[in-house]
Swiss-Prot record:
Belongs to the universal ribosomal protein uS5 family. The N-terminal domain interacts with the head of the 30S subunit; the C-terminal domain interacts with the body and contacts protein S4. The interaction surface between S4 and S5 is involved in control of translational fidelity. This is Small ribosomal subunit protein uS5. The lineage of its organism: Bacteria, Pseudomonadati, Pseudomonadota, Gammaproteobacteria, Vibrionales. One of its GO terms (cellular component) is ribosome. One of its GO terms (molecular function) is rRNA binding. It comes from Vibrio proteolyticus. Keywords: Ribonucleoprotein, Ribosomal protein, RNA-binding, rRNA-binding. Part of the 30S ribosomal subunit. Contacts proteins S4 and S8. With S4 and S12 plays an important role in translational accuracy. Located at the back of the 30S subunit body where it stabilizes the conformation of the head with respect to the body.
Length: 24
């Protein structure tokens, strides 16, 4: 379960980074 949560967190972080790039 811990690994799944870690993967989800990484996926969210990547999405946030992508959104930030688009915002800029």
């Amino acid at each position: 379960m811990a690994k799944e949560q870690q993967v989800q967190a990484n996926d969210l972080q990547e999405k946030l980074i992508a959104v930030n790039r688009v915002a800029k």
